[in-house]
Curated annotation (Swiss-Prot):
This is Cobalt import ATP-binding protein CbiO. Residues 2-236 form the ABC transporter domain. Belongs to the ABC transporter superfamily. Cobalt importer (TC 3.A.1.18.1) family. The lineage of its organism: Bacteria, Pseudomonadati, Pseudomonadota, Gammaproteobacteria, Enterobacterales. It is found in: Cell inner membrane.
Length: 271
């Protein structure tokens, strides 16, 4: 399990995270939302062991995180982060070598590396461009390479920072499909994003942060339907939730579900 217990973190004398109690093992996809400066990025760095809290703990497998070199190495094989900018974690000019980089550092046999790289590229739908030079890839393709680089570690938790930032509508739809495939393999995904519609559609649970504290958390439909909480957090409601709260239309999880239900209603009225 990956969780936090009364987690506090400050930069110099300025508290950034204030007593966070969170459990990311309870839901396949957990969304983190909040205005700029609410602590999302700092939380990610604490979860991955890049930062160490001054009080409280990150809990891994039910125990406080071990910050020794061996402990952090073990954590990062199970909890992998994919940054908003894929350029921050792509080091090679060819895709296969870049994805295999961490496995070779760990001494994984070449046959196993080949198998894992091939599986990861298939999962992120990158087989058709795997032989292109990385510098020729689009931003969205580089994001998929970065995700594949995390997947080859067979991590059980994937931390995605703004996975749809900079993507066109087709790329955004493809990213949602990739996340669903990752979860279908039994993994957990934690998403930090300003794309409120993405978080609503794909998350099973949501934490809303405000000034380093948990303002509210729960099921996406319940959390985002609370207009007062959204305003307090400096957020807007997902458009599907707005249709429900402001117009009284049925609360739907996806655009496809919404239009399907509207078409059924129109058909009934016409008949």
């Amino acid at each position: 399990m990956l969780a936090t217990s009364d987690l506090w973190f400050r930069y110099q004398n300025e508290p950034v995270l204030k007593g966070l109690n969170m459990d990311f093992s309870l839901s396949p996809v957990t969304g983190l939302v909040g205005a700029n400066g609410c602590g999302k990025s700092t939380l990610f760095m604490n979860l991955s062991g890049l930062l160490r809290p001054q009080k409280g703990a990150v809990l891994w497998q039910g125990k406080p995180l071990d910050y020794s070199k061996r402990g952090l190495l073990a954590l990062r094989q199970q909890v992998a982060t994919v940054f908003q900018d894929p350029e921050q974690q792509i080091f090679y000019t060819d895709i296969d070598s870049d994805i295999a980089f961490s496995l070779r550092n760990l001494g994984v046999p070449e046959a196993e590396i080949t198998r894992r790289v091939d599986e990861a590229l298939t999962l992120v739908d990158a087989q058709h461009f795997r032989h292109q030079p990385i510098q020729c890839l689009s931003h969205g393709q580089k994001k998929r390479v970065a995700i594949a680089g995390a997947l080859v570690l067979q991590a059980r938790y994937l931390l995605l920072d703004e996975p749809t930032a900079g993507l066109d509508p087709a790329g955004r739809t493809q990213m949602i499909a990739i996340i669903r495939r990752i979860v279908a393999q039994g993994n957990h995904v934690i998403i930090s994003s300003h794309d409120i519609d993405l978080i609503y559609e794909i998350s099973d649970a949501v934490y809303v942060l405000r000034q380093g504290q948990i303002l509210t958390h729960g099921a996406p439909g319940e959390v985002f339907a609370c207009t007062e909480a959204m305003e307090h957090a400096g957020l807007t409601q997902p458009w599907l939730v707005k249709l429900h709260t402001q117009l009284g239309l049925p609360l739907c999880k996806t655009e496809t579900e919404f239009f399907h239900r509207m078409q059924k209603c129109a058909f009934r009225e016409a008949s």
